[in-house]
């Protein structure tokens, strides 16, 4: 078998790179590679030649070869490549790549970006395997990495990767070498540039990484002296000096909130504390940290994204969630007199806590100005138009309060739940979505978390001694922007007023910091120092005002629900989840919350497997449904399942009639101006629909259940769109012989009579709304009654369409055969005439 060096030499002599690519696809052997002093010479010549020819893919292959040399020989003290001068060669390669990045023609080249990523990966691997190489990187390579981060013309994604590599190399460097670095002239200029970039970068995660780089480059008491040089504003410098290594993540949150607020209208990041956040109905929990009081959501103007961190049940690292503008279909903001709901619809599902989600819903206090921040970060083009928002307001303002019973819950928990009125949300079939929110009375001072930088005890002691007289927490001037106000953008969704004011949050354990960027782990350790809170801090857990609701510590222990996890999207780092279970902590038990969310229709949508084009102008007819008031208990329903099919999120079709409270059914008349989304034929095979039928069989269904008849689309709603598998031919398209035939007339009469028979059978079972029995009709039965009737009419309509289509085809085929018959007869006569002419000629 050829060695890797021999393959590189073959590529040097012009034999191509395909053999190298095949070699790299093999599994790592971890057997030391054999190479000599000529390897570095060949690598240097090849990489520079490929960069000059803009063959960035070949350059990536050569960089991966260097990675293989170090990975296959992890125990070697100082590899030969380092002794021969690999780091200076890499500096020259990096200068060429960064020069190409600044060039506008090649800046968007994907292969060039991949080559830079491979270069950064190579530098990271070398720093992990060679102490000498890490020290050499501090002299020159670190400075070039830092100035690339500060370059405004570089894309944010490249800046973020470069910054992550910079921090990892600094983390691997010895403390004494970092102390020397901070006193060098070039490093001082770099640190001032990094501090300036914090003000303009426009992305919270990059602001954190820049602050981390400054903390790593300044050791001990040097940080206090240098901070006054980095920031012209004395208040900012004093705030930065309050960042402690062992409480870096939460102290940095306080500092950045203070910094962004002081920038006023020039700020590039807006941070707001949210009340609750959901991904396709599943609660996303705040990271479990004693000092992190608020669940922060960041609107980033620079990267045009919304980012936040959530609790990771299977890791000490926080899980990052990033919603990019280009990944969104639309976003809407719905406001009532208590909260604001920020809802994002995504083009493709993203993986959050090992589950795919296409809709992200975040609740804020109504005092916060999230409208202005969201428009500045995402653009007005991503905000849903007013007519679509008004439709979604009706759907998200309490349509799901009809169903409140979850099978299998004990009666005591159900009685406790009846006294509380919660925001209606979706309940998965296999996992209750737990509503874990914070109190409405938002704090002015954000909390801090347990993230820490990896430092020695000597360095930490020196930092603490230098700050003996300083308060441990940033004062109350670290406010999130409460002054940003905007008027209500939609009708008030009154049903949202019943959201729970106080709730509890479980602190499972202390955690480190955010997720690593690719395989660039920042090696942040948990802190063992005193975690006592200052006087201006409060515990996340609140006492409930309603005595029927217990605190979180008094509730049942956590349960792990086995979930059917959808396939995960590929990630660059290659780290895949190891378990197929997601940890769910149900806080509100015995309560079913449903969210009949209709997928947002922005433009014409063609459903797979359907021959009908759905447009935003489609509308169904106006129907009314009178629901007498029900006393005593909440309506019952079964849990609902959701599944992703062909990229669309299918849900069980529901009646569009909302309920204004958890224990009453009132008369409502809803204007259905929503496009048809689900093919009527599909919901009969839906597992959720079958689950509902099974659950109904175990309940007592009172006689005389009422459902308002939905008129047939064949006669009463000719202008409404009908989602069927085939389109009905119009009378003008039908041949005249078929239209006037006795069969056609008889078939039309048959269809009409059968339709009327269906409606008559339903009317015979109808109970007047004024009867007492009608008040006992479950909401699910009323809805199911309407769906059965509609399905019956749709089935008849499809049959009607198919017969007419077959009649049309039959007429055309007969006409074609008739023409062929005439042609055959004419040909026969012509042949016979030719035969007679030959006979006479003889």
UniProtKB/Swiss-Prot annotation:
Q: Which domain of life is it from?
A: Eukaryota
Biased composition regions of type Basic and acidic residues, renumbered to the chain = 458-470, 505-525, 624-633, 643-655
**What is the scientific name of the source organism?**
Mus musculus
Give one Pfam family.
SYCP2_ARLD
Which ranges are annotated Basic residues under compositional bias?
A: 543-559
- GO cellular component entries: condensed chromosome, centromeric region; female germ cell nucleus; lateral element; nucleoplasm
Its BP terms in the Gene Ontology are: negative regulation of programmed cell death
What's the protein here called? Synaptonemal complex protein 2-like
Question: In the UniProt record for this chain, what is stated about the effect of gene disruption?
Answer: Reduced fertility in females: acceleration of the age-associated decline of fertility in female mice, due to progressive loss of oocytes. Males are normal and fertile.
């Amino acid at each position: 078998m050829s060695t890797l060096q021999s393959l590189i030499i073959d590529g040097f002599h012009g034999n191509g790179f395909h053999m190298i690519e095949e070699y790299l696809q093999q599994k790592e052997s971890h057997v030391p590679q054999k190479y000599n002093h000529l390897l570095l010479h060949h690598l240097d010549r090849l990489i520079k030649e490929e960069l000059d020819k803009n063959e960035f893919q070949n350059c990536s292959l050569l960089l991966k070869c260097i990675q293989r040399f170090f990975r296959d020989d992890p125990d070697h003290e100082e590899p030969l490549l380092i002794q021969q001068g690999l780091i200076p060669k890499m500096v020259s390669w990096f200068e060429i790549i960064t020069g190409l990045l600044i060039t506008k023609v090649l800046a968007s080249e994907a292969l060039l970006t991949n080559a830079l990523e491979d270069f950064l990966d190579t530098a990271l691997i070398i720093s992990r395997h060679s102490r000498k190489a890490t020290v050499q990187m501090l002299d020159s390579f670190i400075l070039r990495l830092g100035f690339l981060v500060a370059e405004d013309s570089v894309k944010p994604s490249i800046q973020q990767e470069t910054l992550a590599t910079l921090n990892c190399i600094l983390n691997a460097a010895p403390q004494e070498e970092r102390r020397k670095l901070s006193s060098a002239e070039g490093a001082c200029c770099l640190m001032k540039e990094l501090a300036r970039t914090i003000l303009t970068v426009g992305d919270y995660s990059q602001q954190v990484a820049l602050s981390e780089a400054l903390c790593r480059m300044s050791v001990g008491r040097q940080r206090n002296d240098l901070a006054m040089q980095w920031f012209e504003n004395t208040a900012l410098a004093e705030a930065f000096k309050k960042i402690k290594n062992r409480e870096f993540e939460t102290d940095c949150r306080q500092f950045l909130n203070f910094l962004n607020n002081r920038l006023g209208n020039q700020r590039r990041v807006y941070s707001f504390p949210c009340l609750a956040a959901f991904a396709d109905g599943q609660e996303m929990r705040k990271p479990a940290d004693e000092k992190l009081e608020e669940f922060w959501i960041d609107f980033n103007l620079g990267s045009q994204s919304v980012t936040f961190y959530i609790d990771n049940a299977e890791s000490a690292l926080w899980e990052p969630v990033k919603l990019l503008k280009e990944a969104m279909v639309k976003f809407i903001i719905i406001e009532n007199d208590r909260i604001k709901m920020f809802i994002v619809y995504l083009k493709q599902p993203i993986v959050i806590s090992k589950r795919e989600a296409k809709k992200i819903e975040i609740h804020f206090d109504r005092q916060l100005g999230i409208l202005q921040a969201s428009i500045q970060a995402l653009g007005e083009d991503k905000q849903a138009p007013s007519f679509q928002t008004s439709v979604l307001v009706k759907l998200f303002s309490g349509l799901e309060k009809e169903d409140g019973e979850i099978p299998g819950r004990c009666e005591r928990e159900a009685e406790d739940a009846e006294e509380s009125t919660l925001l209606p949300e979706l309940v998965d079939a296999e996992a209750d979505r737990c509503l874990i929110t914070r109190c409405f009375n938002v704090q002015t001072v954000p909390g801090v978390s347990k993230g820490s930088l990896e430092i020695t005890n000597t360095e930490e002691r020196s930092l603490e001694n230098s700050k003996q007289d300083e308060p441990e927490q940033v004062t109350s001037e670290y406010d999130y922007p409460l002054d940003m106000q905007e008027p209500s953008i939609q009708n008030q969704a009154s049903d949202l007023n019943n959201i729970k004011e106080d709730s509890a949050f479980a602190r499972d354990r202390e955690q480190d910091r955010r997720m690593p960027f690719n395989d660039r782990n920042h090696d942040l350790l948990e802190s063992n120092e005193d975690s006592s809170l200052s006087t201006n801090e409060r515990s996340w857990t609140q006492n409930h005002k309603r005595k029927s609701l217990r605190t979180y510590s008094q509730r049942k222990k956590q349960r792990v629900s086995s979930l059917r996890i959808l396939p995960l999207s590929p990630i660059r780092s290659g780290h895949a989840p190891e378990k197929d279970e997601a940890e769910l902590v149900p806080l509100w038990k015995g309560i079913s919350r449903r969210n009949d969310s209709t997928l947002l229709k922005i433009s014409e949508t063609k459903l797979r497997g359907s021959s009908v084009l759905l447009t935003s102008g489609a509308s169904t007819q106006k129907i009314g449904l009178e629901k007498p008031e029900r006393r005593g208990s909440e309506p019952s329903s079964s849990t609902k399942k959701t599944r992703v099919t062909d990229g669309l999120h299918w849900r069980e079709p529901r009646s569009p009639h909302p309920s204004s409270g958890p224990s009453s059914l009132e008369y409502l008349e809803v204007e259905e101006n929503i496009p048809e989304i689900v093919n009527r034929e599909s919901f009969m095979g839906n597992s959720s629909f079958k689950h509902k039928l099974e659950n109904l069989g175990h309940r007592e269904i009172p006689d005389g259940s009422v459902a308002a008849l939905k008129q047939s689309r064949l006669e009463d709603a000719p202008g409404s769109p009908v989602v069927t598998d085939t389109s009905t031919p119009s009378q003008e398209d039908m041949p005249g012989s078929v239209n006037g035939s006795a069969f056609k007339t008889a078939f039309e009469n048959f269809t009409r009579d059968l339709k009327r028979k269906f409606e008559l059978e339903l009317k015979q079972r109808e109970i007047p709304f004024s009867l007492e029995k009608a008040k006992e009709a479950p909401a699910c039965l009323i809805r199911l009654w309407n769906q059965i009737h509609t399905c019956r009419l749709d089935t008849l309509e499809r049959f009607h369409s198919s017969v007419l289509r077959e009649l049309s085809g039959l007429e055309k085929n007969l006409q074609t055969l008739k023409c062929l018959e005439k042609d055959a007869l004419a040909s026969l006569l012509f042949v016979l005439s030719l035969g007679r002419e030959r006979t006479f000629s003889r």
